[in-house]
Amino acid sequence: MTVWDRPETPSRPVPLDRERIVAAAIALADEGGLEAVSVRKVAARLDAGPMRLYRYISSKEELFDLMVDEVQAEILPEEQPGDWREALGVLAQRTRQAALRHAWLADLLGGRPAMGPNGLAVAEATLSAFDGLADVDTVMRAVETVSAYFIGAIRRETAHLRAEHATGLSKHDWQRAHGPHMTSMLATGRFPALAKAVYDGTDVDAETSFATGLEWVLDGVATKLARPPA
């Protein structure tokens, strides 16, 4: 029986339910990452004994599942997308925005499928946009391909943000600090392609990089979904 199927127990003396437990866990994770979340710490935040929480969840892994499903409600589109491209674009962009609000989400993306009610609703909204467009295997590969892109991009962006927080150096501060070393290495002539990228390339922000890459991936998927001539 999953955590969503198991009935909740009556709450006493401090009011408790899964909604309160999940909200407290998300608050802890937002403040200090997943390492800040434990049944004991959540119980302390709620001024309740840890054993009471085990009446609602059986493990920290179940708690993580509930946290992810709560955030899936933020990812769920407000209205049904008009077509497959919009559906995948909305999924990618809303997942990125959720991860920017909840950095810990990046650590839980890409594993087993989300089985909570909100996660299933997100999957349904995405897949239904392909209705009648292609066979189910093609649709699944399309969704997997775009998901692989945006999950990887989100994790990379999250890693950069964590590095900034840990070191106190922005991206440009870090580049300036390492500039002399990079300049001396490129001056050896051993890295001509890298030198061209460093000196001639255009530096873009994370949002632009994400959006551009997403459009390129969607363009590639479109070639596989194109209907053959009648």
What role is predicted for each listed range?
Residues 1-41, 58-65:
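Basic, helix-initiating cap at the start of DNA-binding domains
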Residues 20-27, 62-77, 90-94, 121-125:
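Alpha-helical structural segments
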Residues 45:
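Residues within the alpha-helical elements of helix-turn-helix
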Residues 48-57:
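Short hydrophobic/aromatic patch on the recognition helix
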Residues 68, 96-125, 155-163, 192-195:
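Amphipathic alpha-helical segments used for helix-helix packing
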Residues 76-120, 137-146:
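Hydrophobic alpha-helical connector segments
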Residues 1-16, 184, 188-199, 229-230:
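N-terminal intrinsically disordered/low-complexity leader segments
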Residues 122-177, 202, 221-224:
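Hydrophobic alpha-helical bundle segments that form small-molecule/ligand-binding pockets
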